[in-house]
């Protein structure tokens, strides 16, 4: 291809046009880790509406806790639901502009058939939904991926 600056171009004279300009090295993004709690109760899962501001503002997500907390204790103390662990699903990484998020999904089964959270959680901030209903909600892509990952477990446990 012809370039009007070719005669004065050092890169062209030294056959370096494919190598120049050298891109700046990418900035290393900080990494944050979190645990998403995928709670199953019969044919439903629990979703929580996120605050309007911040990441995924106003979208529906799984209840979330820090990686150093125990999921069974967290569910009892914060969600008022007694659970048993089913599985830890593979980690999911999602990259935002300013950081990488590593999600550790914990799949949990409600021990009670009528979770107390329906009565004691903040009004309109939690919903028990079927996976089909959840997929119709405003949910971020990582939550959609986690729902797909959990689906085989979900099918198995409602037909036990």
What is the meaning of each model-derived region?
Residues 1-160:
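Intrinsically disordered, low-complexity, charged terminal extensions of DNA damage-control enzymes
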């Amino acid at each position: 291809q012809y370039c009007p600056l070719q005669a004065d171009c050092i890169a062209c004279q030294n056959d370096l046009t494919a190598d120049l300009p050298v891109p700046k090295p990418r900035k290393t993004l900080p990494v944050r880790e979190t645990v998403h709690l995928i709670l199953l109760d019969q044919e439903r899962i629990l979703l929580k509406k996120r605050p309007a501001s911040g990441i995924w503002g106003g979208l529906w997500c799984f209840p979330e806790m820090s990686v150093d907390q125990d999921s069974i204790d967290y569910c009892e103390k914060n969600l008022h639901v007694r659970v048993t662990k089913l599985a830890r699903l593979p980690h999911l990484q999602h990259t935002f502009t300013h950081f990488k998020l590593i999600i550790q999904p914990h799949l949990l089964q409600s021990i009670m058939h009528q979770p107390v959270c329906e009565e004691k959680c903040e009004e309109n901030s939690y919903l028990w939904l079927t996976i089909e209903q959840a997929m119709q909600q405003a949910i971020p892509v990582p939550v959609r991926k986690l729902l797909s990952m959990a689906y085989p477990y979900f099918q198995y446990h409602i037909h036990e």
